Regions:
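Exposed, interaction-prone extracellular/peripheral surfaces
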Residues: 1-32, 39-225
Length: 225
């Protein structure tokens, strides 16, 4: 196994990740998975760094083989996660394209790149950048979801959805609207999962409704703790 390969862990801590219905917020699951992966990478003798981003900030830690670099990454994770609050003022979400361009700059080739996100708002430019990163690096996607988004929406709920600037209330008792929401969520997730076929990118599903460590061990083919 190759040693001292640089690894870059990219962690989404935008407001779209500040959502959870069963166990964790998606932001917490992503942060836990990132921390566990970082420790494992450093223990294997490889360099580790990361990009941690929210809606209006981005922190870059270039890969190094040192505990100090790991500590900087963990601190960036903790700081970004602490900024997520229900009463935070709505801002324009950080575009994934901006983050992926930063990834391409820091990891031009021959890096392990792990991206942990719900991949909210993916467009053609996002996919072009994903394709380019996958050709020059070992790109792995951790698709973070919540069980609420994986199942049929219950009737009789009034949901407030937002794109970061505008808000709208949706009544799930409206069958047509509920079906459109379900189709949109499933279509977005299916599109990300299809990156394996289109770009050869491994897509690892991570649920905020389960403990993070057992999921990672299962995805890596390891037994229970």
């Amino acid at each position: 196994e190759e040693r001292d390969r640089p690894a870059l862990i990219v962690v989404d801590q935008r407001m779209s990740m500040f959502f959870g219905t069963r166990l964790n917020m998606k932001s917490v699951t992503a942060a836990e998975a990132a921390a566990l992966a970082a420790f494992r990478i450093l223990d294997q003798g490889d360099r580790v760094g990361g990009i941690v981003f929210g809606d209006n900030h981005i922190a870059e830690i270039r890969p190094q083989r040192s505990r100090r670099s790991l500590d900087r990454f963990l601190m960036a994770l903790a700081d970004a996660n602490a900024m997520l609050r229900a009463d935070v003022q709505r801002v324009e979400p950080m575009p994934l394209t901006r983050v992926l361009r930063a990834v391409a700059r820091i990891a031009p080739r021959n890096h392990l790149v792990l991206v942990l996100s719900d991949f909210d708002v993916v467009d053609d430019e996002t996919e072009r950048l994903v394709s380019g990163l996958s050709r020059r690096n070992d790109l792995v996607v951790g698709l973070v979801t919540d069980p609420f988004g994986d199942a049929a929406l219950p009737e009789g709920l009034k949901l407030v959805i937002s794109d970061g600037a505008l808000q709208a209330e949706i009544d799930t008792g409206d069958h047509a609207r509920r079906r459109r929401l379900e189709d949109m969520a499933r279509g977005r997730i299916a599109g990300i999962l299809d990156w394996r076929r289109r770009y050869g990118v491994p897509v690892l599903p991570l649920s905020a409704g389960e403990e993070t460590l057992p999921q990672l061990r299962r995805l890596m083919g390891l037994g229970p703790v």
